[in-house]
Amino acid sequence: MNQDTICAIATAQGGAIGSIRVSGPEAITITGRIFTPAKSGKLLSEQKPYTLTFGRIYNGEEMIDEVLVSLFRAPHSYTGEDSTEITCHGSSYILQQVMQLLIKNGCRMAQPGEYTQRAFLNGKMDLSQAEAVADLIASSSAATHRLALSQMRGGFSKELTTLREKLLNFTSMIELELDFSEEDVEFADRSALRRLADEIEEVIARLANSFSVGNVIKNGVPVAIIGETNAGKSTLLNVLLNEDKAIVSDIHGTTRDVIEDTVNIGGITFRFIDTAGIRETSDTIESLGIERTFQKLDQAEIVLWMIDSADAISQLTLLSDKILPRCEHKQLILVFNKVELINETQKNELASQFSEHIGSEIESIFISAKQRLHTDELQQRLVAAAHLPTVTQNDVIVTNVRHYEALTRALDAIHRVQEGLDANISGDFLSQDIRECIFHLSDIAGEVTNDMVLQNIFAHFCIGK
């Protein structure tokens, strides 16, 4: 393990307060070289751990700032190493001066994610918990925050530990039987092993299946805004995002490519996708945009079909022939836009005609994106259509693609064990599949993960974490 002492700014620029983290075998010594306690007369190394000490940072005779230094001794720190945290004023000049002094006295600049990587390598957390730290930092909704917190606190890790213990018990019984194969003694009751395999399979399957919900919670519910040209799709996107993300124009075919962005509505992250308007065109670029429109439609969980209320009937054929067949397993909401251009009688007639033509079970709403009429109600409809479960900090839901892939491979291995037990195959073949299952579960926790995978994971962290 690298024994360098590292330092990094842990706070964003522009705040009133700044924080610098120092970790490694010389963290306390190096910090003590530039820090002078204000009152106690004790050196920093003589201070009690888990305390704050007020004092000053000096560059020779020149005072840089008045600061607070917190002291942590190994192994009782975030990284498991001796650590200090210097809290100073948030001036970028002050922060850079302190960093230069630390580096001059023996620190080196930390790499992205190096603090959390050291915590993992020092056994302070497993790899799934380390990844949860990054998820917690990136959390943008109550649900993503709760899931990241649950995983960081070890909820997922406990499930994995329990599974591995059961699998190790399983394989030990099988291998004990192999050791005494010449004695014709059966140590492992096959029916009991089948019940244990079923129990393990049920837990792994539950965790793997939870990814469909976890992925949506983490990355946002994909909502495709679809419709003919000039139906008001880009205007609606700007209203939902509360910013001018998309260009709005009366010219048909203005949007030629997909525009995506996320926003939190009612505690749920939605990923809105504005698409090119659907129409017959000879323009090659616009045609490619329309192809992408249908690709995004297929990927969406919720589809908003935007309709120009003043020209709605002409869209019935397109809706029936091309849109409805693709939305069989999706939440489709018909959004009649530009409602200010029609009267109440016309509005009722439109609702009746569409209901008669495509069925009354499809949800619809009349809005004016330009005038922001009933857009709040549309947001409420989106929250209801998301159908996401209420998430608590005790829930174990998989949100990480790497974890999902490992669980899928573990599930395949345990399925082979079940099939092998049913076929009464030799214990040595069963043992191979059990060990493969253990391997994939251990990979999630980082017990068998190679260095390249670790570097890729921690490279996505910020410098100060």
UniProtKB/Swiss-Prot annotation:
Which positions, given as ranges, span the membrane?
none
What does this protein's record comment on cofactor binding?
Binds 1 potassium ion per subunit.
One of the record's GO cellular component terms: cytosol
Indicate which residues the UniProt annotation says bind Mg(2+).
S234, T255
Please give the InterPro entries that the UniProt record associates with this protein: G_TrmE, GTP-bd, GTP-bd_TrmE_N, GTPase_MnmE, MnmE_dom2, MnmE_helical, P-loop_NTPase, Small_GTP-bd
* Positions annotated to bind K(+): N230, S249, I251, T254
CDD domains assigned to the protein according to its UniProt record, in alphabetical order: trmE (cd04164), TrmE_N (cd14858)
- Provide the GO MF annotations for this entry: GTP binding; GTPase activity; metal ion binding
Q: Please report the stretch or stretches of sequence annotated as the TrmE-type G domain.
A: 220-387
Note the superkingdom of the native organism.
Answer: Bacteria
Homology family: Belongs to the TRAFAC class TrmE-Era-EngA-EngB-Septin-like GTPase superfamily. TrmE GTPase family.
HAMAP family annotated for this entry?
A: GTPase_MnmE
- In its UniProt entry, what is this protein called? tRNA modification GTPase MnmE
Name the gene behind this protein: mnmE
